[in-house]
Regions:
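Second-shell loop/turn segments in exported
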Residues: 29-41, 69-75, 108-114, 126, ...
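Post-HExxH zinc-binding segment in Zn-dependent metallohydrolases
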Residues: 58, 66-110, 157-170
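Juxtacatalytic substrate-recognition/specificity segment
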Residues: 1-69, 150
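Sec/Tat-exported extracytoplasmic proteins
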Residues: 1, 46-50, 54-62, 84, ...
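Soluble non-cytosolic domains of exported or imported proteins
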Residues: 36-45, 75-79, 114-118, 130, ...
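Long, well-structured alpha-helical subdomains associated
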Residues: 94-143
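Beta/coil-rich, acidic/histidine-enriched accessory regions frequently appended to metallopeptidases
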Residues: 141-181
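Secretory-pathway/luminal and periplasmic proteins that interact with or process carbohydrate-rich
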Residues: 11-16, 93-97, 145-152
Length: 181
């Protein structure tokens, strides 16, 4: 079962999900509604947080490893966690991603992007475009002999390149795109 908790407490910006199969979502309208465009803010946040729950259930370690350790051993970068939630539930929007992303690319500071949603979404789009949508699923569902997801190993197996090389290829692609405009 998945538990969804709606709250009016102002301690939560939008919402968050945890590996224990629950999500907490703030129902009061906030500044984040400005970047959702025509999409209803609550629908956007709910879809995003539910995607996190799908992710957590996909990457869990073997049944014999107790919580929370079975959720912490895979080494998945935060940009994947947030990026695929954005990729599967949202659209690239000017106020949500484009302006910040363009700013960092043009100033050669993509390595300083603080929010893993921004570069994560961009990297997820690039990953899917270059290797296909199904590669994301293959990477996250791959298990080694011990029945663990080793993200770096799985990434290389299903893309043919290392994460480091992927990040460099992505950076070059972003430079080519933004500097050619």
């Amino acid at each position: 079962t998945l538990d969804i908790i709606f709250t009016a407490e102002d301690e939560v910006l939008n919402g968050f999900a945890v590996p224990a199969n629950y999500t907490i979502i703030w129902v009061d309208q906030n500044d984040a509604a400005l970047w959702t465009g025509d999409e209803k803010w609550l629908r956007t946040v709910l879809a995003h947080e539910l995607q996190h729950l799908v992710y957590f259930n996909t990457v869990k370690g073997p049944w014999w490893l107790p919580e929370p350790m079975n959720s912490l051993v895979h080494g998945t970068p935060t940009w994947i966690v947030e990026g695929i939630a954005e990729y599967f539930t949202e659209e690239w929007r000017p106020f949500r991603y484009e302006l910040s992303h363009r700013y960092h690319v043009l100033r050669n500071t993509v390595h300083k992007i603080q929010d893993p949603h921004n570069d994560g979404y961009s990297k997820s789009l690039y990953l899917a475009d270059r290797f296909g949508d199904s590669t994301i699923s293959k990477i996250l569902n791959h298990r080694n002999k011990l029945k663990f997801l080793d993200f770096k190993e799985s990434f290389k197996k299903h893309t043919g390149i290392t994460l480091k090389q992927f990040n460099e290829d992505w950076r070059r692609q972003m430079n080519t795109f933004y500097f050619s405009q």
